[in-house]
Structures are given as C-alpha cells and as structure tokens.
Amino acid sequence: IKRKFGDSIRERKWGNKKKIVSLMAIVYNIHVIVRGGGENQFLILLVSLSFKSLKIDVCNRAFIIYYLSKQVIEMGKKFTQELWREIEDIYKSILSHPFLKGLTDGSLDENSFRFYVIQDALYLREFARTLSIAAAKSPREKWIMMFNEHSLGALKVERALHESFFRDFGLKKTDILNTPLAPTNLAYTSYLLAVAYSCPFSEIIGAVLPCYWIYWEVGKALVSKGSPNPLYQRWIDTYAGEEYSKIVEAVLTLTEEIARELKNAEKKAFKRHFVTTSRFEWMFWDMGFRCEQWPV
C-alpha cells in the first residue's frame, strides 16, 4: 500500500489541505488500479482494510467505497462497449450485405432464402449443444439455469421454423435432417463446439455472444424497414418479440459481470473468440446468398 500511495499515507497529522490532497492522491491511484484490470482488484480490498491505519474518517471512507463501486461497475459496462467497437466494421458489412438488402427490398432470390432457413435450422441444433456445455461449465446456478433454458429455446425455434416455413417449402423434417451442413455452417458450428469443449466458461460466452447480439441488432434494423415480400416479412416479424430482447440483455449483463473478474489475458481470449464468430456471422449470411456448396 505504501509503495502504491507514497507519502500521502505516511502523514499522520493531516490538516484540511493536506487531507484533501492526500485523499485526491489515494483516489487517483485507486482509479489507476481499477482501470488496470481485474488482476489488480485485490488491491482494492487492501485499501479498504487499511482505512483504520490510514485514519480516514467515516465520510471519506464512504466516498472512497462509493467511488470504487462505481468504477468497478463502469469497468464492466465498458467491456461490452469495447467488444462492440471491435466488430463495428463487421456489423456494417453485415447490414450492407445483398442478402439483407434483398430481404428488405424484396429482391432476394427465394432459393437463397430457403437455403438460408434450412441451414439456420441445422445451425440451431449445434448451437443448442454449445449452450448446454456452457450451462455445464457455468460457475453460478442462475447461469446454469439460463443457458439450459436458452438451449431448449434454440430447439423450439428450430421446430417453429419447420411448422411455419418448411411446410410452405414442401419439406418434411427428414428432408432437413438429411441436408448436409454447408461448408461455412460446418466451420462455424465446429468452432463453437471446439471452444465449448476445450475452453473455460468465459471463452464460451465470447464465442456465442455474437449470435445473440448481432442477430438482435440485425433484427431491429430489419423490423424498422420491413419487406414487400409477405414471406420475408413473416420471417422478419420473428425478430420483433420483446422476449428475445430480454434474452440478449441478460447475456450482455452476464458478460459485464464476467469481465469484472477476468485478467487481461482472459479478456483478450474473450475478444478473440468474439471477433472470430462475428466474422462467421457475416459469412453465414453470405453462405445463404450464394447457396454455398462444397467446391469439390
């Protein structure tokens, strides 16, 4: 503590001016500690335990505790902001992709749409498996429950796609199950499952978050524009429910909570998976647009 805060804590006879300067020095250094990352947060505990030896009065203790709490909360929130800044260009590329533009202006080839929806159903099955593994590795009971519910929800969405769209396409469930994963779909889902099986809980969240978050943001953009094609409009309407918004917000809140406990190296790993699967999100739309097939 003395090495961190210097002479300000050695002073035993504080006058008003010296007290203010000393408190400013302490608060500034606490700010540096908190902004430095989760691995330094144990120093916050040392500071709080040192209040008595530092002879800091009750009012100033309250101020420092308030400041610490606020900074820790802000640090968590800013992590999700950092994440979004990492993928802003990717997200802009998704919004400008001809698949999405074709949805909203009605020009998208229906074969591309059909291909996409089928592959999306196949994706959801593997995504559900990934979420089940996330639940198994969750360090908190509430997260175990949440991801098990999300896994079940993904399977329900797959079933709803069959009931609403696949019947229109004249497809049976066996037709979907016998459809092979397109190259991009196989790569994306294989990556998710590899992370889920081999990485810690925080990295799994980094890998699955873009599917939640980008899909939500894209959905809001699509809903605001609509489509002249009734089939596409019906699909866009699936984005409009408030229930999905609550699901995404819960995962974002979880991300902020996780970030407060991560070391810098762990945050980098989180971001690496987050950016990679965000790229896969763009590739998935592109896969649908091109009706991607194996080249050989």
Locations of regions flagged by a protein language model:
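Acidic, carboxylate-rich catalytic segments that either coordinate divalent cations
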Residues: 270-296
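Active-site-proximal alpha-helical scaffolds that flank and shape metal-associated catalytic sites
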Residues: 142-246, 275, 279
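Alpha-helical bundle segments that constitute or directly flank the non-heme di-iron/ferroxidase center
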Residues: 88-93, 107-137, 157, 206-216, ...
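A non-catalytic, amphipathic alpha-helix used as a structural packing/dimerization or gating element
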Residues: 115-126, 149, 153, 269-276, ...
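Basic, amphipathic alpha-helical segments enriched in Lys/Arg and hydrophobic/aromatic residues
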Residues: 1-65
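Structural motif
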Residues: 12-21, 110, 198-205, 269, ...
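Long amphipathic all-alpha helical oligomerization modules
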Residues: 244-274
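Short alpha-helical hairpin
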Residues: 84-108, 127, 252-261
